[in-house]
């Protein structure tokens, strides 16, 4: 990350990706990066051409992955199984890699507790609060009813204390997850093993751990670039956590497309 915290593109050097693609990785979030953020999450779809760009990236780079808080089955339904592309869902709890589904076994034992929490909140939630079961996690969305966010966070905190689940806050949501150490940062660290350079594209609170890991990996000698994507759910910390801030998913996809084509993406109008 740039020392001045500005996210200025003047600090960004893509030459390792262009000159040494076989030791480089390209990792990206899904919502707000490959797809527009929409009020109804069920209506979010990849931008036109996104799947082709991801496929082209996989033809060029050593590691390409889509890393999301969504269930991996959802990612597969939107993007398909693209050869040599790893789909990581639920912040790392599950993934599709080399055509095979893998689930973190240590989290599976929490299934019944999460289901019980979903049943409980469905009976108590105020009108307008959206309840989403995401496999082994439970999310309460207040995007359509912002006045319910405080209630959701308080309920989640109490449920976390009584069950051992972990409450994780988003800008307009709160998520209950199994108490297993995983996030987008742990995913980035795992996927970057053996690479000389790695970049990550993200827009939300859940992407901040990935950017923090990139900062540490850089201090250890790896070349890293953190790309922030402006979105309605952009956290205040995003601008100071990234090297480059692009204007929405369309510009993020254009940058990814440049990398896939092996063309120089700088200066990029960020």
Predicted features and spans:
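Non-catalytic pre-domain segments flanking phosphatase-related domains
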Residues: 1-30, 34-42, 49, 59, ...
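Conserved acidic, metal-coordinating active-site core of Asp-based
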Residues: 128, 132-214, 219-223
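Short hydrophobic/aromatic-enriched beta-strand-loop microsegments
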Residues: 84-91, 150, 219-226
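A structural signal for isolated positions on well-ordered beta-strands in alpha/beta enzyme cores
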Residues: 63-65, 86, 139, 199, ...
């Amino acid at each position: 990350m740039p020392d001045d915290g500005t996210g200025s593109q003047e600090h960004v050097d893509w030459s390792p990706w262009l000159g040494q693609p076989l030791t480089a990785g390209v990792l990206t979030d899904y919502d707000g990066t490959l797809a527009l953020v929409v009020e109804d999450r069920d209506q979010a779809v990849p931008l036109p051409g996104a799947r082709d760009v991801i496929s082209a990236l996989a033809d060029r780079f050593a590691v390409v992955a889509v890393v999301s808080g969504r269930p991996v089955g959802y990612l597969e339904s939107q993007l398909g199984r693209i050869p040599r592309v790893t789909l990581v869902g639920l912040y790392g709890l599950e993934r599709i890699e080399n055509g095979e589904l893998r689930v973190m076994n240590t989290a599976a034992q929490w299934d019944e507790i999460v289901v019980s929490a979903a049943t409980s909140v469905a009976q108590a939630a105020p009108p307008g609060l959206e309840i989403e079961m995401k496999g082994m996690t439970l999310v309460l969305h207040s995007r359509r009813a912002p006045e319910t966010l405080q209630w959701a966070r308080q309920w989640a905190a109490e449920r976390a204390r009584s069950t051992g689940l972990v409450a994780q806050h988003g800008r307009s949501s709160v998520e209950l997850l199994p108490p297993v150490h995983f996030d987008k940062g742990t995913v980035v660290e795992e996927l970057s093993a053996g690479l000389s350079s790695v970049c990550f594209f993200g827009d939300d609170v859940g992407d901040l751990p990935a950017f923090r890991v990139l900062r540490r990996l850089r201090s250890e000698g790896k070349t890293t670039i953190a790309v922030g994507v402006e979105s309605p759910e952009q956290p205040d910390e995003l601008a100071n956590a990234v090297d480059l801030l692009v204007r929405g998913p369309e510009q993020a996809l254009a940058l990814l497309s440049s990398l896939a084509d092996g063309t120089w993406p700088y200066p990029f109008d960020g």
